Amino acid sequence: MISLKPVTKENIDELLALSIREDQRTFVSTVADSLAQAYVYHETAYPFAVYEDDVIVGFIMMAYYEVKQYYTLWKFLIDKNHQNKGIGKEALRQGIDFLKEKFQVKEVYTGVVPNNAVAKKVYGDAGFKPTGLYEFGMEEWRLDCA
């Protein structure tokens, strides 16, 4: 069973041990970098450990992007040993549900590195669509939650 749980002192070491494939390193932030950003943006960032039963298998972080005044899927990774099992799809759904329940969002945004075909497939399958806008080298995608 997949679940999202807050980052705590009890699970941070397991989170920091997550790893991705070498070919994913240019697309995905490390958990350490993501948690540093969560610390700085603690009022608007929502980091979670992704669990499969009692094992941490990933990390997801949503946030409020103040510049554009919208909620975003900011960081997302599934450990290389747990990919291609549907875990990411379910974690993404739960992350979106968190934003819908907590903030009654009508839309969620994310950024995708233009040549990241895997992310485009995952987000496209979840209903995200490209907006045609680019920022910081990322292609903006939007999910209509209404």
What are these regions (language model features)?
Residues 125-126, 137-141:
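Short, Lys/Arg-rich amphipathic alpha-helical interaction segments
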Residues 89, 114-132:
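Conserved active-site alpha-helix within GNAT-family acetyltransferase domains
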Residues 100-111:
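Conserved GNAT acetyl-CoA-binding A-motif
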Residues 109-120, 136-139, 146:
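Conserved beta-strand-loop-alpha-helix junction that forms the acyl-donor binding cleft
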Residues 2-74, 79-81, 98, 131-136:
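Acetyl-CoA-dependent GNAT
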